[in-house]
């Protein structure tokens, strides 16, 4: 009934199911892709130094993320696949727990199940009690609610995770699209006091640059000893 009502609107219905963009890709991006089409070949698994440097500079310029090196960045061929395989490649497996938001992007749960871990839904650290999960996904701004996790909340998550050795993957694909307030990256030093151990930020050009289906994104942060395994297996 709600859908039928929306379809009767003069401007038509807006499909929010998968966030498909309705605007065209920026002409400058179209031109850059066309120019690069004459250079076939497989890319470096970890990305070119120029690309990784550009990502580091962009994070600092846009989101005040400082202190990153090029080695802290891994370009990925689509963030959906990277998210789905991230716990597995970082050593999560049977007997482990992966915490995911109560209402969330379905691929977080898929990621836990693929690794063989147990997914646990929780929006509050209090819900987890004394447990020490191996891995945690957070999402700010949230898909689908739009909720932004504030500075105080993020600092508590980081401190809690550092005490327990929990890896935190912050899905920041919508960080440039906050409706209320200014979203913060988990890699911002105001959040982590300069200690990014076990903290990963996920970014997708599908949202920030209107490039859905282009399979372009990256992960930034400080990977643990499994980082090389992650980079190689994601190739």
Q: Can you name each region flagged by the protein language model?
A:
Residues 169:
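Generic enzyme active-site microenvironment
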Residues 191-235:
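Conserved core segment of the aminotransferase class I/II
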Residues 172:
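Walker B catalytic acidic pair
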Residues 1-43, 164-166:
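N-terminal "arm"/small-domain region of PLP-dependent enzymes with the aminotransferase-like
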Residues 38-160, 175-193, 200:
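Conserved core of the PLP fold type I
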Residues 23-26, 144-146, 176-177, 209-212:
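Short catalytic/ligand-binding loop motif for oxyanion handling, primarily in non-cytosolic enzymes
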Residues 2, 26-30, 51-53, 154, ...:
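A general structural signal for well-ordered alpha-helical segments in protein cores
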């Amino acid at each position: 009934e709600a859908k039928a009502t929306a379809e009767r609107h003069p401007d038509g219905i807006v499909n929010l199911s998968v966030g498909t963009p309705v605007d065209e890709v920026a002409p400058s991006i179209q031109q850059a892709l066309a120019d690069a089409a004459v250079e076939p070949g497989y890319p470096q698994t970890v990305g070119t130094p120029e690309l990784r440097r550009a990502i580091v500079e962009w994070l600092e310029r846009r989101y005040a993320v400082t202190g990153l090196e090029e080695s802290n960045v891994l370009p990925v061929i689509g963030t959906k696949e990277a998210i789905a395989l991230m716990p597995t490649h970082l050593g999560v497996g049977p007997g482990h727990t992966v915490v995911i938001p109560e209402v969330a992007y379905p691929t977080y749960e898929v990621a836990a199940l693929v690794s063989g871990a147990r997914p646990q839904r929780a929006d509050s650290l209090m819900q987890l009690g004394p447990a020490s999960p191996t891995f945690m996904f957070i999402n700010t701004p949230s898909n689908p609610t739009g909720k932004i996790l504030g500075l105080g909340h993020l600092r508590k998550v980081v401190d809690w995770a550092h005490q327990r050795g929990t890896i935190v993957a912050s899905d920041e694909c919508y960080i440039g699209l906050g409706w209320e307030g200014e979203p913060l990256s988990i890699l911002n030093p105001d959040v982590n006091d300069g200690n990014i151990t076990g903290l990963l930020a996920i970014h997708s050009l599908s949202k920030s640059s209107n490039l859905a289906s282009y399979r372009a994104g990256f992960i930034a942060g400080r990977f643990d000893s499994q980082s090389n395994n992650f980079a190689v297996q994601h190739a």
